[in-house]
Amino acid sequence: MIKRKKLYFMKITIIGSGAWGSTLAQVLTDNNNQVLLYDTNLSYVEKINQGKHPIFNTPLLNVKAVSCLKQTLEYSDLIVLAVPMKFMRHLLKKITLMLTNPKSFVNVSKGIEPLTFLRVSEIVKQVIPAPLLANFASLMGPSHAEEVILRKLTLLTAASSNPVFSLEIQKLFSCPNYLKVYTSSDLVGNEICSAFKNILALINGILVAKDFGINSQAALMSRGILEMSRLVTFYQGNPQTVLGLPGLGDLIVTAFSKYSRNFNAGAKIAAGIPYQQIIDSSLQTVEGFQTLNAFYQLQLKHNLDLPIIQASYQLIFESKPFDTVFATLIQRPYKSEF
């Protein structure tokens, strides 16, 4: 038997008290852990300290929130990152200036950084000095906060290059009654799949709004999974991860659910609303737009075969007519499926 070093945390800091961050606070307190949430949104902080979830009309008990980042960093040695991708690097730079001892990080945000094409794990390693970075893991999978807050059965995957740490995160977040966590060593694949599925959800929202049938949606999912696999391979991840919870599982949830911000944003695109207007009017971040831009630029730079990404970019960012983009995509040369 392998003797493992104890990494279990009884105090956890969550940075970002939005829908998912606050919901994960409930998961952790259900497991008898102590949680401190951080947010710059003072109304969120006030609601949480009143025992209310800041987004949903549900109680959030035994959780405290503050607006002082230094206080939250001093609270525990485990930091859960639950902020949108566009704020990630800036946040990590602020954290680095305040760290005095090594911390472990768990990322629950999904996306790729534009321009750099970096995953969250890569940004963390780039920004946080090695002596101050104890461990890193991602926690991903099909998990609408709207259902988890009601304690409906959900499965997630904790991925880390450190198998001991992924096991500890599995134990920390698993609730016997409603949340089960698997482990994975494919951190790369989990991050890519979790980001890519938001793009397919955007496009599926467009298809549904334009009254395309389930046959068309199934075709989008199938060919989209193939492109997801190509990207995972490009990033040197395990293509098998595409069939796991952060891949196929999260894709189903995001592309077909009424709760999905990306799916609903796609429907608005179909109605002729510009993507920037959708972003500006959304109370919660629609990660699919930024991720689409990042993967499109990556495709151009490395000459990758990602026709759905290319068509989606033309439709959303270049405002090309849907019929024109669709015709170009469907009239691609005939060839073998794989």
Swiss-Prot record:
Pathway membership, UniProt: Membrane lipid metabolism; glycerophospholipid metabolism
Lineage: Bacteria, Bacillati, Mycoplasmatota, Mollicutes, Acholeplasmatales
Protein name per the record: Glycerol-3-phosphate dehydrogenase [NAD(P)+]
Binding positions for sn-glycerol 3-phosphate per the UniProt entry: K110, G141, S143, K197, D250, S260, R261, N262
Compartments, as annotated in UniProt: Cytoplasm
Family: Belongs to the NAD-dependent glycerol-3-phosphate dehydrogenase family.
GO molecular function, one term: NAD binding
GO cellular component, one term: cytosol
Main location: cytoplasm
Binding site for NADPH: W20, K110, A145, R261, E287
EC identifiers of the protein: 1.1.1.94
Role of this protein: Catalyzes the reduction of the glycolytic intermediate dihydroxyacetone phosphate (DHAP) to sn-glycerol 3-phosphate (G3P), the key precursor for phospholipid synthesis.
Catalytic residues (positions): K197 (proton acceptor)
EC top class named in words: oxidoreductase
Xref: PANTHER family: GLYCEROL-3-PHOSPHATE DEHYDROGENASE, GLYCEROL-3-PHOSPHATE DEHYDROGENASE [NAD(+)] 2, CHLOROPLASTIC
Species name: Aster yellows witches'-broom phytoplasma (strain AYWB)
Reaction catalysed by this enzyme: sn-glycerol 3-phosphate + NAD(+) = dihydroxyacetone phosphate + NADH + H(+); sn-glycerol 3-phosphate + NADP(+) = dihydroxyacetone phosphate + NADPH + H(+)
HAMAP family, per the entry: NAD_Glyc3P_dehydrog
BP GO annotations: carbohydrate metabolic process; glycerol-3-phosphate biosynthetic process; glycerol-3-phosphate catabolic process; glycerophospholipid metabolic process; phospholipid biosynthetic process
Keywords on record: Cytoplasm, Lipid biosynthesis, Lipid metabolism, NAD, NADP, Nucleotide-binding, Oxidoreductase, Phospholipid biosynthesis, Phospholipid metabolism
Gene3D superfamilies to which the protein is assigned, alphabetical: N-(1-d-carboxylethyl)-l-norvaline Dehydrogenase, domain 2 (1.10.1040.10), NAD(P)-binding Rossmann-like Domain (3.40.50.720)
